[in-house]
Amino acid sequence: MSVRAVRRAVMLVLVPAALLSQGSTPALDFSGVLFGNFQYRTDSAARAATAGQPGDRFDLGRAYLNFRLPAGDRGAVRVTTDVYQQTGTAAAYYAGWAIRLKYGYFQYELTRDLAGVQGLAAAARIGMLQTVIVEHEETFWPRWMGNSPTEFNGFFSSADVGLSALITLPNRYGEVYTTMVNGPGYSSGENDRYKDFAGRVSITPFGRDSGFLRTLTVTPWYSVGALASQFVLGGPGQVGPVSQGLEKNRRGVFLGIRDRRLTGGLELAQRLETVESGLNTAASPRLTSDVTRDLVSGFAFVRPLEIFDPKRRSPFSVFGRHDRFDNANVVGARNILTWFGALWDVNARMTFSIDYQELKAENPPVVPPTNTTVPTRSMFLHWVVNY
């Protein structure tokens, strides 16, 4: 056999194998977000830690790394790592930046024509996934500047471990999202036997239009859950273990719009909880009370030059946000967040903001409980890069 014939035979074997290898390699979709800030604090708490002088520091907020891969027929996997600085007890061992999992779930596309309705799609997820409302809010409020209203005020963590279902409505009319999760959030493991069940319906009534109201979204949502009693195991001197769960419900409605000229949101929400007091002993019996805490939040981002001239793309915008959240301990006491500033787009993927943030207690109790809000006043230089 000639050398040319041998070479031809080898090529006939290797080329199909190479093509098969290329065809069987799944496509990796990688993206990321990196953001941080410089902050200058002038409140009394900051001055107390610096001998009466204002405090300042550079901070790296987060580095999110997103990996998306197909996983078989109709299947896909998303893994998002969260690079953050250690705090709390973990900082005693290592106070630097660490990596943890933010999202890690498998998604299976059930159908694109649910119940025979064309365009009515359904998918299911399992793993560490989005909670009911936070990521939806973050399509209107930029996470790199700070937490969304519900996450900032302790309603939810942004991710948790469990199951979820997503139904996409036809003709761009919105979606339905439901979850069953552990409850503590992605930064903690499960700590009791209870689960949180939640759902939202996001309606875009003008989704098929091409005008300003195309992204207007109305989202009612509800979450039902419970917490274990602090006396679930009983103990020395107690009258016995407490097996009943404590109410941990949340509900609200979010209204949002997303356009280059104006992006904003308005949220009305409630935290409904059962709290315990006493020591669960004969001398100090366990008592429970139901507490409802109201949240009213609104924010807006405006590009004033584009409002006056829609054909002109401007890198400059201004924003403001105001949160009012009830204090659980005293009637009439509230935590007030005031936030405003200006943003500048360096390019299509990087943005800076200069903003002022103040958190204060309105009508604080005369004898503060341990969870009373510590007033803060800060100037920030925020920055974000998407890649």
Over which residues does each language-model region extend?
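Detector for outer-membrane/organellar transmembrane beta-barrel domains
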Residues: 194, 202-204, 210-328, 336, ...
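Predominantly the C-terminal beta-signal and adjacent terminal strand-loop region
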Residues: 347-387
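Cleavable N-terminal export/targeting peptides
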Residues: 1-24
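C-terminal structured "cap/appendage" subdomains that terminate the fold
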Residues: 336-350
